Amino acid sequence: ICFKNNPKSYTYSADKVVWLTNPQWLVPELCKVYRGGRLQTDVTEIWQFEAGQNNYWRIKYRSGYEGEYTDGQINVVKTCLDEETSMNTYAYLKQVAAINPLRKEEDKEGILSQIYEKVDFIDDKTAAACYINPDKHKVRILSHKDLIYPFGCNASQKKAVAAAFEHQVSVVQGPPGTGKTQTILNVIANIVRNGETVLVVSNNNSAITNVQEKLEKYGLAFIVAPLGSKENKELFISQQTLVPTEVSLWSCPMQDGMRMKSTLHDTLRSLDKVYALLNEDAMLRQEQQSVDLEWRHFCMDNGIDEHTPLERRVQSSLIIRLWLHYQSKADGTLIAPDGLWSRITEGLKSLWMRIICRYRLRLHNKFEQSDMKPLVIELQTLYYLNRRIEIEERLETIRQELSTYDADLLTKTLTDTSMTLFKASLHGRYDKRESILFKDTKD
């Protein structure tokens, strides 16, 4: 290999060199180039070189300068509005927006139509592309790792945070006081920890203020820029905060960071077990109430003592199969098998059920082909008696398993470890960085 302004040639092994050929030219008007997170507005040419799973880029600027970059150095995004289907769908959406009455006056377009008119670029990797051209742009299931929960969580909040990083669009719904703000804070923490930015929007200022105040409470106000109205922007400009000096204390040596990540993973595994047990406990208690209520009504309807002792322990799942089978025979709703093999199979099934009823459940005197009702009542009785005991025993087992965990301590460990890792990421991002002060709202 020879280099410019150097007559000497050099040799390299094949694994040390990437030979890039046959570049693809991209239309600059249909792409956006970001460097260091900032949009490059003076791009005149974009060339893409592919080498295996990697992309290399040559970008030419209006000044004449040409730069070579890898995917990690720049981000080139393409619009989907150059596709016919996308253009037609988006044109339809703009027409629908034009007739929307939101803030629409006789001599003024509606606000929704104004917003649509301002959009001339839709990244083909965004969720919007999946909606306006679903045949080409498929919904993506994303992967995530090492999620942190510095603001605490419960089972549903943990699931919601994970879903936010697995799907392009997530909806978290719940009444006031169910922890939606806490979930949002954990999502924000994970986004910022990954070195990215996040825009938090709402139809009212109080929701945004709530998030901001929670971040201030943990000494994280310096990462927030409250914007929105002109007054809010001007207030932000006049009250800009520098990076606090305590950020220098948030460093975390690599060895300590690895240890904390290991602790975080172990804690999450234990909490997952606790959450699963608590969820099962809640579902079983709900089922217990339903089964007890059904049992009382069943006893009243059939003249059975509610305190009837259980003589034979049998799995309730087996009993309910027998119950439903003979109930359909008693009601005359059992579907007759069609075909020889089906009749043989159904015959063997009926024989197996008769054997179970006669010899395992010992229901000899209840087994009358001409009248199945007594057998059905006996099976129902056995089901309720067995299922009630099964639920009680499982609840006791869950109680004993939960007693081996300290859920409060696990939650505190999760929160503290996550916050330490989050602040360590902020230290790496802001400690040596000069504070940026904006002069006006146009910066």
Description of each model-found segment:
Residues 157, 172-181:
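Glycine-rich phosphate-binding P-loop
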Residues 158-165, 185-190:
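Contiguous, well-ordered alpha-helical segments that form the cores/surfaces of helical PPI scaffolds
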Residues 1-70, 312-374:
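Extended hydrophobic/aromatic-rich secondary-structure runs
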Residues 7, 14-16, 22-163, 236-254, ...:
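Pre-P-loop entry segment of helicase/translocase ATPase cores
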Residues 17, 148-149, 178, 201:
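Short, contiguous acidic/charged loop-to-helix segments that flank catalytic cores in large enzymes
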Residues 166-172, 196:
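Pre-Walker A (Motif I) flank of P-loop NTPase domains
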Residues 111-145, 209-442:
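Conserved P-loop NTPase motor core of helicases/translocases
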Residues 178, 183-215, 224-228:
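Conserved RecA-like ASCE P-loop NTPase motor core of nucleic-acid helicases/translocases
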